[in-house]
A protein has these predicted regions:
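Extended boundary segments
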Residues: 1-47, 118-120
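Short, basic/aromatic beta-hairpin or loop at an interaction surface
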Residues: 43-58
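Glycine- and charge-enriched low-complexity intrinsically disordered segments
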Residues: 102-122
Length: 122
C-alpha cells in the first residue's frame, strides 16, 4: 500500500537522481526504523547545504561507501523533519514538495509551515 503525503493523496516521487529516501527508493517513505523521519521532500539550496554542514551533516561530499554522490543546489532530497524545522527556525529552510512529503512529517511540523515553503502547488 502506498504511503500518503501531507495532503492525504498517494506519496509521489521526490527524486531519483540522486536516489533519495530512507529506503533509497526515490520517495520519502518511512517506517519505525527511520528514527530520523526522512519525510520532507525538499529542493536543497546552497544556504541550506552550508547550514546542514555547520550542524555536522555534510550532504555535499560524495560518500561512495554509502553510494551517496553528494548533493548540489537544486537536488531533491528526503530530509529529516526535525532538521527542516531547525533550518526554518534559522531562516534557511529549503522549499518543499508537498505531494512528495510524507504525512508522517506532520507529527513534527505543522502543515501551515510546510505550505509557506511549497513549490509544487499553484
Amino acid at each position: 500500500m502506498k504511503q500518503k503525503n501531507v495532503l492525504g493523496t498517494d506519496l509521489e516521487i521526490c527524486n531519483e537522481n540522486p536516489m533519495t529516501g530512507f529506503f533509497r527508493d526515490g520517495c520519502c517513505n518511512t517506517n519505525e526504523m527511520d528514527v530520523g523521519s526522512h519525510t520532507v521532500c525538499v529542493i536543497v539550496t546552497k544556504e541550506f547545504l552550508e547550514f546542514s554542514k555547520s550542524k555536522g551533516n555534510d550532504l555535499t561530499t560524495p560518500r561512495p561507501e554509502y553510494d551517496f554522490p553528494g548533493l548540489n543546489p537544486g537536488d531533491g532530497w528526503c530530509l529529516c523533519a526535525a532538521r527542516w524545522l531547525e533550518a526554518e527556525d534559522e531562516g534557511c529552510a529549503p522549499r518543499v514538495k508537498l505531494l512528495s512529503t510524507n504525512e508522517k512529517a506532520l507529527e513534527i511540523i505543522e502543515i501551515e509551515k510546510l505550505k509557506k515553503y511549497q513549490i509544487d502547488l499553484n
